[in-house]
Swiss-Prot record:
This is Cysteine--tRNA ligase. Its EC number is 6.1.1.16. Disulfide bonds: none annotated. Belongs to the class-I aminoacyl-tRNA synthetase family. Coiled coil: none annotated. Its cofactor is Zn(2+). A motif ('HIGH' region) lies at residues 31-41. ATP binds at K268. It comes from the Bacteria. The gene is cysS.
Length: 507
């Protein structure tokens, strides 16, 4: 199956040809760990988790690198405010980041290098840029000379004159041009020794050095949020190509769209910053969060709002009912149990490792093993369904055609709705295969409906059902409906039956 990817560099949807047919190399800009990640940060991680899953399905091996920026002005400020060291702040928020991605069932990247573990490589790259005539040192600072790179602006589709003279930049009399950017910042507070004096690296050089260290001078895919296209990715591309003459750096650039909340940009001043913890505390399950994030094409803007959450809940309830009614999920455990039918899990027991060594050989080997297990299991399952020669083959093909068409998750979800409808319409002899296919396609997307995630207790649900029954007897249907809708927002579906007691299904 051919994979097509929208390449920001060309502005076109292109057929994907990796440098090697045996291994795909992908780098994604990870978090700057100074605060709890908001849902916009998490969207990017979920997007590239989907990309990773598709690549694992289509290619023998994938090396997925996502960095951790653990030295930055924002981290230094946060540490100063708290009166602690920078590494304590960084480790704390790195842990929360990983915790949130674990809740959303994201596969671990192959390698997760940290900026502070690669300072020497950054210094070497900066020296190479100076030697090649692309950078200059002034007063302990080192700047990249944007005028020395003819392709500057190609990625972000901006004219060099606009970039150099038209953008808003810091006033710095040491710069040759207003658009020149920092490679090494002189600092005697948080610093490392260098040929130019004590200081620390600029943000852009960090990713360039870590891609070179983990993937080499040329690799296949570079991903990140649309907000990183300029200046971060433009600068990263410039310094990497100049430090490694003849290199093309990343061949395909992929950018995910912005995320807003109720039509507005997230802001602490507006009080509308949303993160995984606050959503889960409000009753939104991790499966629902993930489903909302993949329900819009990765490249498009996504607005987080109650309507989107409601649509996700309705879809997942529909899928779960199809799985319950088919017997794939046992009805006796529909709200409290889990089911293992031989699909991949990312929750295998891990070796004891030093949490400060995210790029250690042990962790890399573990992550490669998990990715290989996921790829093997998924291919075994879908080769089986794809070879049945019936509706299963059709749905399997349609689903993966969508996923191979620029990671079209909305199209793939539409196939799931058709498949779910099919589970209810076909004869008994076909139900089992179709329902198992539905379950496994959801697993491929990172959604496991076999595990109850709702934090709403059974006692609370029963008490609400009793209140609702009392309201109906008293003909207070407005309040009865309010209770029903309130439970639905928490992922609990009430089912009324003509000749049987009311029951419920929980996500």
């Amino acid at each position: 199956m051919k994979l097509r990817v929208h390449n920001t560099l060309s502005g076109l949807k292109e057929e994907f040809f990796p440098l090697s047919s045996e291994v795909v190399r992908m780098y994604v800009c990870g978090p700057t760990v100074y605060d709890v990640p908001h849902i916009g940060n998490i969207r990017a991680s979920v997007v590239y988790d989907i990309v990773y899953r598709v690549l694992l399905k289509l290619f023998p091996e994938v090396i997925y690198v996502r960095n951790i920026t653990d030295v930055d002005d924002k981290i230094i400020t946060a540490a100063s405010v708290r009166g602690v060291k920078c590494d304590k702040v960084a480790l704390h928020y790195e842990h929360i980041f990983h915790e949130h991605l674990g809740l959303l069932n994201c596969l671990s990247p192959t390698v997760e290098p940290k900026a502070t573990q690669n300072i020497g490589k950054m210094i070497s790259m900066i020296q190479a840029l100076i030697d090649n005539g692309n950078a200059y040192s002034v007063g302990g600072n080192v700047y990249f000379d944007v005028g020395s790179f003819a392709e500057y602006g190609v990625l972000s589709k901006r004219k060099k004159e606009q970039l150099v003279y038209g953008v808003r930049v810091e006033k710095d009399v040491d710069k040759k041009h207003p658009g020149d950017f920092i490679l090494w910042k002189s600092d005697d507070h948080v610093y490392w020794p260098s040929p130019w004096g004590n200081g620390r690296p600029g943000w852009h050089i960090e990713c360039s050095a870590m891609t070179l260290a983990t993937l080499g001078a040329d690799f296949d895919i570079h991903g990140g949020g649309a907000d990183l296209k300029f200046p971060h990715h433009e600068n990263e591309r410039a310094q990497s190509m100049c430090a490694n003459p003849g290199s093309q750096f990343a061949r395909y650039w992929v950018h995910n769209g912005f995320l807003t909340v109720n039509g507005e940009k997230m802001s602490k001043s507006l009080g509308n910053v949303v993160n995984v913890d606050t959503l889960v505390e409000s009753g939104v399950t991790p499966n629902v969060i993930r489903f909302v994030l993949i329900s819009t094409h990765y490249s498009k803007p996504l607005d987080w709002n109650d309507a989107m959450v409601g649509e996700a809940i309705n879809s997942l309830i529909k899928f779960k009912l199809a799985l319950l009614d088919s017997g794939v999920l046992p009805k006796s455990k529909s709200h409290i149990g889990s089911l293992n039918i031989g699909v991949c899990s990312d929750n295998a027991e891990d070796e004891e490792v030093d949490p400060r060594s995210c790029a250690s050989e042990v962790i890399v080997a573990r992550n490669k093993r998990k990715a290989k297990n996921f790829s093997k299991k998924m291919n075994e399952i879908f080769n089986k369904f794809g070879g049945l020669g019936d509706d299963c083959s059709i749905y399997t093909r349609e689903f993966f055609e969508c996923m191979a068409d620029d990671f079209n998750t909305p199209g793939a979800i539409a196939v799931l709705h058709k498949l779910s409808d099919g589970v209810r319409l076909v004869g008994a002899e076909k139900v089992n295969n179709l329902a198992h296919l539905l379950y496994n396609l959801l697993i491929f997307l990172g959604i496991d409906l076999g595990v109850r995630q709702s934090s709403v207790s059974e006692d609370f649900i029963r008490s609400q059902l009793q209140k609702r029954a009392d309201c109906k007897r008293q003909k207070d249907f407005v309040e009865a409906d309010r209770i029903r809708f309130a439970l639905a927002k928490m992922g609990v579906l009430i089912r009324d039956h003509k000749h049987a007691p009311t029951d419920w299904v929980s996500l």
